From Swiss-Prot:
InterPro entries: Calycin (IPR012674), Lipocalin (IPR002345), Lipocln_cytosolic_FA-bd_dom (IPR000566), von_Ebner_gland (IPR002450). This is von Ebner gland protein 1. Belongs to the calycin superfamily. Lipocalin family. SUPFAM superfamilies: Lipocalins. Disulfide bonds join C80-C172. Homodimer. It comes from Rattus norvegicus (Rat). The gene is Vegp1. It is found in: Secreted. Residues 1-18 form the signal peptide. Could play a role in taste reception. Could be necessary for the concentration and delivery of sapid molecules in the gustatory system. One of its GO terms (biological process) is sensory perception of taste. The lineage of its organism: Eukaryota, Metazoa, Chordata, Craniata, Vertebrata. GO terms for cellular component: extracellular space. Gene3D superfamilies: 2.40.128.20.
Length: 177
C-alpha cells in the first residue's frame, strides 16, 4: 500500500514510445494551478483502495534551468499529507525525470485546451509501474478531455477500465481529517 500511495501521491509522469503521443512543444508553460481529473495505472486497483482519496489542486512552479516543482496535498484515510517533488528537465522536449532518474515522465498536451496528460513510469521498491494522469486548469470534468485521455491510455497499453476519477478538494489542512 505504501508503494501504491507513493505512486499515486507523487503525480510524476513518464514514458511511452514517442510515436504513441502527439508532438510536444519545446517551451510549453505548465506553471500554475492544475487539477487532477483522472488517472490510470498499469495494474488493477480495487475501488476500495482509493474510495476515501481526495486531492487538492497541484501547484507547479518553473524553477531555474527549466525544472519543475510540483506540490499538492492529498487526503488519504482521513489524514492530509503534503506531497512535493522536483521534476528535472532533460534534453528531450517535455521529458522530465525524478528521484535520480528512477522515474521518467512526459507532459503531453491534450487535444483539449488547458488540459495535459502526464504519463510516467518508474520503479518504487523494486516494483515497476506506469501511470497516466489527466490534469486541467479547472476542477470540472471535461468529457472531450476524458475521451482524449482514454485514447492515450489505450495507446500506452494501459486498460481504460482502470481509470480512476479522484474527489476534488480546494483545501486540506495538514494533519487534519
Amino acid at each position: 500500500m505504501k508503494a501504491l500511495l507513493l505512486t499515486f501521491g507523487l503525480s510524476l509522469l513518464a514514458a511511452l514510445q514517442a510515436q504513441a503521443f502527439p508532438t510536444t512543444e519545446e517551451n510549453q508553460d505548465v506553471s500554475g494551478t492544475w487539477y487532477l481529473k483522472a488517472a490510470a495505472w498499469d495494474k488493477e486497483i480495487p475501488d476500495k483502495k482509493f474510495g476515501s482519496v481526495s486531492v487538492t489542486p497541484m501547484k507547479i512552479k518553473t524553477l531555474e534551468g527549466g525544472n519543475l516543482q510540483v506540490k499538492f496535498t492529498v487526503l488519504i484515510a482521513g489524514r492530509c499529507k503534503e506531497m512535493s517533488t522536483v521534476l528535472e528537465k532533460t534534453d528531450e522536449p517535455a521529458k522530465y525525470t525524478a528521484y535520480s532518474g528512477k522515474q521518467v515522465l512526459y507532459i503531453i498536451p491534450s487535444s483539449v485546451e488547458d488540459h495535459y496528460i502526464f504519463y510516467y513510469e518508474g520503479k518504487i521498491h523494486r516494483h515497476h509501474f506506469q501511470i497516466a494522469k489527466l490534469v486541467g486548469r479547472d476542477p470540472e470534468i471535461n468529457q472531450e478531455a476524458l475521451e482524449d485521455f482514454q485514447s492515450v491510455v489505450r495507446a500506452g497499453g494501459l486498460n481504460p477500465d482502470n481509470i480512476f476519477i479522484p474527489k476534488q478538494s480546494e483545501t486540506c489542512p495538514l494533519g487534519s481529517n
